[in-house]
């Protein structure tokens, strides 16, 4: 009997873990966008007016729980919890719930960035949160939850990143480190996440997951409620989990400890795609992109060109400040069938701590748009760049097809097909790409969705005529505005 019960328990745990890799997308949609620091009311409007019509699958939103008020209102104050009340600079609980409902109604899922590892760092005296809650972080006193000192690990600093104990039980940059093995802490975290599930979210991005023991996270995840069927989720659906685990390949705490609990952020993807499109690695090598590069299996990898953290760091990672290379890298990211794709939507920054666009009272301001739909008032909105939202449509059109017809020039010009539904070509050389290439598409004329749009049967950008053998003449000049060309069956003239 014991053996049967143990087997049943293991099977249930395995099935729950597998279910936590499912992002619950509508139809053929398969791209998440991180609307970093947006207000809930603006996200709701964006779902209805842009993301839904453009085929985006979901939105990662900034942390929803009450956070400390920091001088100047830097973005990172959102990562310093005071309580689990749903009041932040982005809005209150009513506005959050309205946003989730409206986005779900148009097929755009919501994934919340959640902070399970810690509470706020030290603050002189009494700290006040965005909902008016008082706390004394230096005493580990957070009455808004409530947490007291006994709910935290003993104070210590991470000085050796190769020491598992320090990484998982000491304070990350001074943030008060919760003890996730505590029954009380577990109950409060589960209560917080279950409340968000009741409001209709589809899942969670778990911040600083590597700083928590995987067995503690497994307990918390497995204790969560199923997703709310009133928001269109099938019965017994589990929340999608993707976990921030920075693993460059030599870490004491490995991504492999978390990959079976849910997806894991694949930081090596971000670094290597940046290296390639910055010219430090020839694009021809991308033919084997994926696990051959040491990446996680596709269904366990949350992939991105940049995120809100590493876009602010020096190094290989690309961001909006290198737009031509960034758009090429994003096109490759969304065209190549590897990983669970997320694109970044940023605000402009001059230094690491730059706050989101705000008014004189330090309230976040809504994005404004020009005649082309691009943002103009401090918001970058990469997701509204035609070259990026068009590739979201490309990715939808070619879903469930494989790479075929790979071509390269032995250097930095490449092309490939996605079955007989899509074709991508990239030129990252300092000379033109001018070549008859196999597009694998049915005969006809296709609109290049990078340089233009198909409107009322006419293409506003380049077009390519494909012959009966699937070949078309592809030209990408070295001085063209964009170094990429994309065709697919839903953009046939």
Swiss-Prot record:
EC numbers: 3.2.1.1
Catalytic activity entry: Endohydrolysis of (1->4)-alpha-D-glucosidic linkages in polysaccharides containing three or more (1->4)-alpha-linked D-glucose units
Binding site for Ca(2+): 117, 168, 177, 211
Keywords from the named record: Calcium, Carbohydrate metabolism, Chloride, Disulfide bond, Glycosidase, Hydrolase, Metal-binding, Pyrrolidone carboxylic acid, Secreted, Signal
Binding note for cofactor: Binds 1 Ca(2+) ion per subunit. Binds 1 Cl(-) ion per subunit.
Disulfide pattern: 47-103, 156-170, 375-381, 417-440, 447-459
Stated name of the protein: Alpha-amylase-related protein
Organism the protein comes from: Drosophila melanogaster (Fruit fly)
Gene: Amyrel
